[in-house]
């Protein structure tokens, strides 16, 4: 007992000097964890960092394709000072993404495991005091098939804004989203992992200096889609209090809207399993090793589009599904009924979402920048698996976006805008309007800046490509070298906006450009240099696509009635 008291006295003394000599130890409901202190250049306040804290049992054996279960308790002091393994995924794609997106000075070497349900915590709190700082829980992107927690260092955001940052991992790909669309494997396992992590935060974050009554979930791309799903899910009620969806929401056709059962059969067949019944497929796939499932995953070529085969037979991603549990009914119904979590909500897109990085990842044949309408129509149809645009709609879409030019380079740019609108712009506005109409505070932004850290291969004129805002949100200029004063100030402003929103449900604050609420006037903020308010983001595009889809639905139901007669 006296040893514990002595340790506590010395820890208090060290912390008061700002240079702790003893590593931080914190109690969780499962056992004690030992972390490390990190200091950001220019700040005396150290950040206590805990890497690889388990929030659930390893999802192995019978827990593959099953909801996560709470972690087993431990009786020793668990060292949580090194990054956890990433969830199983394509290692080459993971490395490519980390190189492009990370705010770290150098890439953290990757290890992969099915045992991957861990989270990282960055807390600037004095752990000897009863601090109650706002908590920001990050859900990474990567198309629900790649990436992990080690891409994001939470120290700059934690120390600049005095918030507790938590970065979670969740099952990906086949492991995270395999669905037979019935009780044998409902799917959405990765989203259920996210819910489990939020339960862990509620139970434990107070001991890390965080306030469990002030939790903001935020995520980008598939992480933004995940945030959007959690906003709709009754399972996540009261687990968070604000939400930020960056560059994707539930209606992104890449990640939601396709039948999962044909994909399940294809996966099972590639694994050498019988596909006669759901039970047979699930039982067989549970017997496969991690490496055998990875081999199947690589054969499926997730994260790329097949521009040669039948697009209706191609599955570039494993989708979020309506499972009756996480999503009890269709998102459209949940939004119409206003039966979702009406927390303050920030939704945003980047100016050129489909500018360079996603076409490159998906192998779009656009490198020559020489496009004509016929080729554009062909590419749109081949991209059906990620866009869900039927052949009937393609001529109208091509005419609307490309009809005003004959120049191949301009046509290419407009074509990229078309796809960006389908995947990101239009769904984001639709979700924001639904949230606003339910009476919840809503804010929108469009990010319009080219970070200095992006690849030299990218066209110079491209401002606000997919994921560009990550460098500002995560304080990359304070970890990487070469940022200008302008870029440093932009990052400070963006971190302040995000943290203000986490604190108050409103991004505005002293010394910041005014960010209008997204009300009936549809004000939003253009984030760039300078940042300025504007109105009606993508409203004409939303009108066009809403009308076009409604016409198609009406024709389909009229045809169905005719057939029935």
Curated annotation (Swiss-Prot):
EC number, as in UniProt: 3.1.1.1, 3.1.1.13
Family: Belongs to the type-B carboxylesterase/lipase family.
Any single biological process term in GO: chylomicron assembly
Protein name: Liver carboxylesterase 1
A Pfam match: COesterase
GO molecular function, one term: carboxylesterase activity
Keyword check for DNA damage: no
Cellular component, GO, one term: lipid droplet
Keywords per UniProt: Cytoplasm, Disulfide bond, Endoplasmic reticulum, Glycoprotein, Hydrolase, Lipid droplet, Lipid metabolism, Phosphoprotein, Serine esterase, Signal
Oligomeric form and interacting partners: Homotrimer and homohexamer. Binds to beta-glucuronidase.
Tissue occurrence: Detected in kidney, liver and lung.
List of glycosylated residues: 388, 489
Active-site residues from the entry: 221 (acyl-ester intermediate), 353 (charge relay system), 466 (charge relay system)
Annotated function: Involved in the detoxification of xenobiotics and in the activation of ester and amide prodrugs. Hydrolyzes aromatic and aliphatic esters, but has no catalytic activity toward amides or a fatty acyl-CoA ester. Displays fatty acid ethyl ester synthase activity, catalyzing the ethyl esterification of oleic acid to ethyloleate. Converts monoacylglycerides to free fatty acids and glycerol. Hydrolyzes of 2-arachidonoylglycerol and prostaglandins.
Tagged with keyword Hydrolase: yes
Induction: Up-regulated in liver upon feeding a diet enriched in cholestyramine or cholate.
Cellular compartment(s): Endoplasmic reticulum lumen; Cytoplasm; Lipid droplet
Signal peptide positions (record): 1-18
Organism listed in the record: Mus musculus (Mouse)
Catalytic activity annotation: a carboxylic ester + H2O = an alcohol + a carboxylate + H(+); cholesteryl (9Z-octadecenoate) + H2O = cholesterol + (9Z)-octadecenoate + H(+); 2-(5Z,8Z,11Z,14Z-eicosatetraenoyl)-glycerol + H2O = glycerol + (5Z,8Z,11Z,14Z)-eicosatetraenoate + H(+); prostaglandin E2 1-glyceryl ester + H2O = prostaglandin E2 + glycerol + H(+)
Cysteine-cysteine disulfides: 87-116, 273-284
Top-rank EC class of the record's enzyme: hydrolase
Phosphoserine, modified sites: 378
InterPro entries: AB_hydrolase_fold (IPR029058), CarbesteraseB (IPR002018), Carboxylesterase_B_AS (IPR019826), Carboxylesterase_B_CS (IPR019819), Type-B_Carboxylest/Lipase (IPR050309)
PANTHER family for the chain: CARBOXYLESTERASE (PTHR11559)
């Amino acid at each position: 007992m006296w040893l514990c008291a002595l340790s506590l006295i010395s820890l208090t003394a060290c912390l008061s000097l700002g240079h702790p000599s003893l590593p931080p130890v914190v109690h969780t409901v499962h056992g004690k964890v030992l972390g490390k202190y990190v200091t950001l250049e220019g700040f005396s306040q150290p950040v206590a960092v805990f890497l690889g804290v388990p929030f659930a049992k390893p999802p192995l054996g019978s827990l593959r394709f099953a909801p996560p279960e709470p972690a087993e308790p431990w009786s020793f002091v668990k060292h949580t000072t090194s990054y956890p393994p990433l969830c199983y995924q394509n290692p080459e794609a993971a490395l490519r993404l980390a190189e492009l997106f990370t705010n770290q000075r150098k890439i953290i070497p990757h290890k992969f495991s099915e045992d991957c349900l861990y989270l990282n915590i960055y807390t600037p709190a004095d752990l000897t005091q009863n601090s109650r700082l706002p908590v920001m829980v990050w859900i990474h992107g990567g198309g629900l098939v790649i990436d992990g927690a080690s891409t994001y260092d939470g120290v700059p955001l934690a120390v600049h804004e005095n918030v507790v940052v938590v970065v979670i991992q969740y099952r990906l790909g086949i492991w995270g989203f395999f669905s037979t669309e019935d009780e044998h494997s409902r799917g959405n396992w990765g989203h259920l992992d996210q819910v489990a992590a939020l339960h862990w935060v509620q139970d434990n974050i107070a001991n890390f200096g965080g306030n469990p009554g002030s939790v903001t979930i935020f995520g980008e791309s598939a992480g933004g889609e995940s945030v959007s799903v959690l906003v709709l899910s009754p399972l996540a009620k009261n687990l968070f209090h604000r939400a930020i969806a960056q560059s994707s929401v539930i209606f992104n056709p890449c990640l939601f809207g396709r039948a999962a059962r044909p994909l399940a059969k294809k996966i099972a067949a590639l694994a050498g399993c019988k596909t006669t019944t759901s039970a047979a497929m699930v039982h067989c796939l549970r017997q496969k090793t991690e490496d055998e499932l990875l081999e199947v995953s690589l054969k499926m070529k997730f994260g790329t589009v097949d521009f040669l085969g039948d697009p209706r037979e191609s599955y570039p991603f494993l989708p979020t599904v309506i499972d009756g549990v996480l999503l009890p009914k269709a998102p459209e119904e949940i939004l119409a009924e206003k039966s979702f979590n009406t927390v303050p909500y920030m939704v945003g897109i980047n100016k050129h979402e489909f500018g360079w990085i996603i076409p490159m990842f998906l192998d779009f044949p656009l490198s020559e920048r020489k496009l004509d309408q016929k080729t554009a129509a062909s590419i749109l149809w081949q991209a059906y698996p990620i866009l869900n645009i039927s052949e009937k709609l393609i001529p109208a879409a091509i005419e609307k976006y490309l009809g005003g030019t004959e120049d191949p380079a301009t046509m290419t740019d407009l074509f990229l805008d078309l796809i960006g609108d389908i995947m990101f712009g239009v769904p984001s506005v639709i979700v924001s309007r639904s949230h606003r109409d339910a009476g919840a505070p809503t804010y929108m932004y469009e990010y319009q800046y080219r970070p200095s850290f992006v690849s030299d291969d990218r066209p110079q004129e491209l401002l606000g490509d997919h994921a560009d805002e990550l460098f500002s949100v995560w304080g990359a200029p304070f970890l990487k070298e070469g940022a200008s004063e302008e870029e440093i100030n932009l990052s400070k402003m963006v971190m302040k906006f995000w943290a203000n929103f986490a604190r108050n449900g409103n991004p505005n604050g002293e010394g910041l450009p005014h960010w209008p609420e997204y009300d009936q006037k549809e004000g939003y903020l253009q984030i760039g240099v300078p940042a300025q308010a504007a109105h009606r983001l993508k409203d004409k595009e939303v009108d066009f696509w809403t009308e076009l889809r409604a016409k198609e639905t009406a024709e389909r139901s009229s045809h169905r009635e005719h057939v029935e007669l």
